[in-house]
Amino acid sequence: MISRITLGASVATPGSVIHRDGRAARWAASNGIAAIFSGAEAAAERLRGLPEWRNARTLKANPDSAQLPVRQRALEDGKTVYMAVPRLAGPEPFFALDPDHLSESPRKAASISGAARSARKVALAELAPVDLVVVGCVAVGEDGARLGKGGGFADLEFALAGAAGLIGPGTVAVTTVHELQLQPAGGIPLAEHDVPVDLVITPDRIIDCRDRRAPRPVAGIRWPELTPEKIAAIPLLAAEWAGRPDR
């Protein structure tokens, strides 16, 4: 994943804060969580109107605040939401939010603190197949190429879920962003492990990238690209690594 991309007169880097005249896109990778952007509610509503949304019963979503409105609407619409525990910490690195068994409102339950109260923590093996993947980003190209916060967790989650058979070639990946986070096609280079998105949703429009996005990486974990420190920091990875016969 690249580490920086120019956005107009500003430069977005993982860990940066961007604020355009106090009126539009703003986000911060503070403690690994991207802050909500102006128009996030409208973007979530636009996503809600798509057939890909209506047909989905199970979502896998990132835990960032920018996509909280998406997670909220999923619960309101009766969808099961699997939300990654930040940094995939612990042996059960996903929250399983069941819309029929929430201890508080969908809005509160969709937050990280609310999920800790309303959801069960589950292992990867306990997840059901995923119908729609929701990811966050700092910037995204009109060709679906995305710039994350630099930790590589979204790509890693996708690889793990793909290897487990929870995500297939036809599973749609979507992000919600502000218009100022958009880059022209070709503006964000992709590494071999980077997962492009199929749909980009802004408060004002829908960009379908499926006919022009790069191919997705082959399902599975790219072990040579992971450092021993990264593997040791994520219990799920450490367990997978320990079970490899060729390690």
Annotated model-derived regions:
Residues 3-35, 43, 49-56, 77-80, ...:
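Surface-exposed, charge/polar-rich loops and edge strands
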Residues 61-75, 79-81, 87:
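Extended, H/D-rich, highly charged conserved domains that either
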